[in-house]
């Protein structure tokens, strides 16, 4: 009886204190001062300074404060009042935050803290933020500055090194397995980019938490609809192929058969037109062998660095600059090469922006975004390397400018971290999600179809192998992002 009476007195004291706090916070800021000389604005500022940072408090920080306040009164309660795990998961839930126009990534200032104060009292009274004994808070703390910059620099460095892989695969570019390997990596990039946008970036932009809002199954169904139509289209194309051999190809054919009978000059113009339309990539090189070019011309274009450099030096002479960058004069290099370099620099800057903002939210989010970008950059950089060679650069020049554009990712990462620390990163997640969807569906998906077009037209075992590689890449990328999303709460680094 004494225990219950003491518990009731403590609860009454807490209620009175919270009521007084509510009255103080609801008073117009700056109009009056309290008995101790501190105005309501100063009280709010002290709370934000003590429990938040940068004159604001994040939702996880506010939730931790409520858990701390609610946990302090639970030791003397009997077992009947112990909250369940479900109550703990509803502390400042997404629908509650939405009433105030907030999300999981929002930063709450003085005015916002004053407005949300009634809900804070309701959460404390209902013990929605009370944890079970020996149970840690559900919300994981934000990464430290060292973790954000350390993991960010590491991931961006690994991604940037992909730009140097192009030179190592030059001797194998005319091999059959190179084309099939490239096809798998393109499909893998589509799967990771599309799934990362569905599972993480777009939900993060809306403030959803995969552990609380249970959106993952619905996102998986969205991918299932995409994959179902892809699978059905390929099967129908294989079944109905005999009907298409008479010249009645379906309306999505991008390259009529007459183009492949043109001269080498017309073919080169077609490739350049395709590159300028944004459908460039690893498909440009494997098509060279199928389009009827002579072996000698292919060997000259895809031989070792010395062959390319010698050929260019004999035609245009050295640049007169750095010896390591010796090759054709910059004024003689095709305009397409500079367009590709500049567009790649902008592309990599946005990639870095997404990586930096993701790491400010959580280490898991940053790693997931980096994995998706890495899978996309690998085949993308290989294709860019070939484009720069075809435009007239030497291997040394192509490596240098490809790596230079890749380094723009560092600049984007820095801006992303600064924006994520001082502003809500939800807008960056929304921008990155749209970009990932476009790259996957409008850029790399047509590229994958173009790489596999020759095998599909031939039919037989070649078509089945190509179809298997496409499915393996798509499903592998989907599985990687699905596993990372489901087990995000168990991923702990550092």
Swiss-Prot record:
Broad class of the protein's primary localization: membrane
Motif (HHHGHXHX-motif): 248-255
Bilayer disposition of the protein: Multi-pass membrane protein
GO BP annotation list: cellular response to glucose stimulus; cellular response to insulin stimulus; import across plasma membrane; inorganic cation transmembrane transport; intracellular monoatomic cation homeostasis; intracellular zinc ion homeostasis; iron import into cell; iron ion transmembrane transport
Motif (XEXPHE-motif): 376-381
One annotated Gene Ontology cellular component of this protein: early endosome membrane
Keywords annotated in UniProt: Cell membrane, Endosome, Ion transport, Lysosome, Membrane, Signal, Transmembrane, Transmembrane helix, Transport, Zinc, Zinc transport
Ranges annotated as spanning the membrane: 153-173, 182-202, 220-240, 398-418, 427-447, 463-483
Subcellular locations according to the entry: Cell membrane; Apical cell membrane; Basolateral cell membrane; Early endosome membrane
Gene disruption: observed consequences: Embryos with CRISPR-induced slc39a14 null mutations display altered manganese homeostasis. This is associated with manganese deposition in the brain and altered locomotor activity. Mutants survived into adulthood without any obvious morphological or developmental defects.
Family membership: Belongs to the ZIP transporter (TC 2.A.5) family.
Purpose: Broad-scope metal ion transporter with a preference for zinc uptake. Also mediates cellular uptake of nontransferrin-bound iron.
Quaternary state and interactors: Homotrimer.
Name of the featured protein: Metal cation symporter ZIP14
Record organism: Danio rerio
């Amino acid at each position: 009886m004494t225990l219950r009476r003491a518990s009731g007195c403590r609860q009454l004291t807490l209620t009175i204190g919270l009521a007084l706090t509510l009255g103080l916070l609801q008073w117009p800021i700056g109009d009056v001062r309290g008995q101790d000389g501190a105005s309501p604005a100063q009280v709010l500022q002290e709370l934000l300074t003590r429990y938040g940072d940068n004159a604001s408090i994040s939702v996880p920080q506010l939730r931790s404060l409520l858990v701390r306040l609610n946990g302090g009164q639970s030791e003397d309660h009997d077992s009947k009042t112990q909250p369940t795990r479900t109550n703990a998961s509803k502390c400042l839930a997404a629908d509650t935050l939405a009433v105030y126009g907030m999300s999981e990534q929002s930063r709450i200032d003085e005015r916002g803290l004053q407005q949300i104060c009634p809900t804070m009292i309701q959460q404390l009274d209902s013990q929605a933020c009370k944890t079970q004994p020996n149970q840690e808070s559900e919300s994981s703390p934000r990464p430290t500055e060292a973790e954000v910059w350390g993991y960010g620099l590491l991931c961006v460095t690994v991604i940037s090194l992909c730009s140097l892989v192009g030179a190592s695969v030059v001797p194998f570019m005319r091999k059959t397995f190179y084309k099939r390997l490239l096809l798998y990596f393109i499909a893998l990039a589509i799967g990771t980019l599309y799934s990362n946008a569905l599972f993480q970036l777009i939900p993060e932009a809306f403030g959803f938490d995969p552990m609380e809002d249970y959106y993952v199954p619905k996102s998986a169904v969205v991918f299932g609809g995409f994959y179902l139509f892809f699978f059905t289209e390929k099967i129908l194309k294989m079944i109905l192929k005999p009907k298409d051999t008479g010249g009645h190809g379906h309306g999505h054919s991008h390259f009529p058969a007459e183009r492949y009978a043109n001269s080498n000059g017309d073919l080169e113009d077609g490739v350049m037109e395709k590159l300028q339309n944004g459908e460039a990539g690893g498909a440009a090189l494997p098509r060279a062998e199928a389009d009827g070019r002579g072996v000698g011309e292919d060997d000259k274009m895809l031989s070792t660095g010395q062959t390319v450099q010698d050929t260019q030096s004999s035609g245009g002479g050295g640049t007169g600059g750095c010896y390591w960058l010796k090759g054709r004069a910059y004024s003689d290099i095709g305009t397409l090469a500079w367009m590709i370099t500049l567009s790649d620099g902008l592309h990599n800057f946005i990639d870095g922006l997404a990586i930096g903002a993701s790491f400010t939210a959580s280490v898991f989010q940053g790693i997931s975004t980096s994995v998706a970008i890495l899978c996309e950059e690998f085949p993308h950089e290989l294709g860019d390397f070939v484009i720069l060679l075809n435009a007239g650069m030497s291997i040394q020049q192509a490596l240098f400018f490809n790596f230079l554009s890749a380094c723009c990712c560092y600049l984007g990462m820095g801006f992303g971290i600064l924006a994520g620390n001082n502003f809500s990163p939800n807008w960056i997640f929304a921008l990155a999600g749209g970009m990932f969807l476009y790259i996957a569906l409008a850029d790399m998906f047509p590229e994958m179809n173009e790489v596999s077009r020759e095998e599909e037209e031939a039919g037989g075992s070649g078509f089945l192998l190509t179809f298997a590689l496409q499915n393996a890449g798509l499903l592998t990328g989907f599985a990687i992002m699905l596993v990372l999303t489901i087990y995000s709460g168990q991923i702990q680094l550092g």
